Amino acid sequence: FSFHTELQVRITDINYAGHMGNDTVVSLMHEARYRFMAHHGLEELNVEGLGVIIADNVIVYKSEAFAGEVLMIGVAVTDFNKYGCDFVYQLTEKASGREVARAKTGIVFFNYQTRAVQKVPQSFLTLFAPERISS
């Protein structure tokens, strides 16, 4: 992963079982994706005038996380197709290096004016998949 960000598990992220709730992982993925995009000068609602919408989420839980722990979240972009790609994540507890989860978010690019899926913008390909740019 070429990009990493840190997020702390809050007490409000803890469920009745005493560990981080599964729904929190989706929120952490969203925040990490937002930070990744901002790091590259992008916004989820404006990549060459197109928005990003979520097509799917997959999470594989590896261990529990607890209030106060700091998670290091690695983010990368992979598996491009005509209309989108996958964001992949690895969540590890910073102090111990314990893996907490692996995840992916499938996204597609969307024109909110025409309400239609669009091809991956060239500028996004240039940043993350230069080998896929058509001449």
Predicted segments with their positions:
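Hot-dog-fold acyl-thioester-processing enzymes
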Residues: 1-56, 110-135
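HotDog/MaoC-like acyl-thioester-processing domains
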Residues: 1-5, 61, 67, 77-135
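Generic secretory/membrane-interface signal
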Residues: 7-9, 16, 50-51, 73, ...
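Short, positively charged
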Residues: 43, 49-50, 68-72, 88-90
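Helix-adjacent hinge/juxtasegments
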Residues: 55, 60-73
